Regions:
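Cysteine-centered catalytic environments shared across enzyme families
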Residues: 1-162
Length: 162
């Protein structure tokens, strides 16, 4: 299911019939999703501080996570958090959780291949992908605004948005 989703997401779906929870994170990990297992419970949230509010969750420092936080700043190894027992669901992964089951699996991986297209074909493909991406982001129920930092790209983006 997640392979077919296009965009940024982190979500949970409860299947009442199977008594299962399905958690998933987008392909590149843009949206965060943290979790911890506390006895029979799976506690999850988009921020660690929300998990720490759970009465059974203790804020115990994870040395590896703290070293990364101070060593490389906001960048970090996928899956690592500054607190013991609290993990970040890696990009392009999902979890299926029930009382007697915990499955964590990668649903997608970036693949590389040799580039054989001509410059013209490459430019055509990039234009299509860029326009498709922008057009999907323009779907909104509120007025849209465009904020572009790079001046030389501004006119191009505005033309696509029209």
């Amino acid at each position: 299911m997640c392979k077919k989703l296009n965009g940024v997401f982190a979500f949970a779906i409860w299947n009442d019939k199977k008594q299962e929870l399905f958690l998933a994170r987008d392909h590149f990990g843009i949206k965060p999703l943290y979790y911890t297992r506390l006895n029979d419970e799976l506690v999850f949230a988009s921020e660690v501080k929300a998990i720490l509010k759970h009465p059974n969750c203790k804020a115990v420092i994870n040395k590896e996570g703290i070293e990364e936080l101070f060593g490389i700043g906001p960048s970090h190894t996928p899956g690592i958090s500054p607190f013991k027992g609290i993990k970040e669901l890696e990009p392009a992964n999902f979890i299926i959780y029930s009382k007697d089951k915990f499955i964590k699996k990668e649903y997608w991986a970036l693949k590389t291949k040799n580039h054989t297209d001509s410059l013209e074909k490459t430019c055509e493909n990039i234009r299509f992908l860029l326009e498709d991406s922008i057009n999907r982001q323009l779907i909104s129920d509120v007025p849209l605004r465009l904020f572009i930092i790079w001046r030389f790209r501004f006119k191009y983006y505005c033309n696509i948005c029209e």
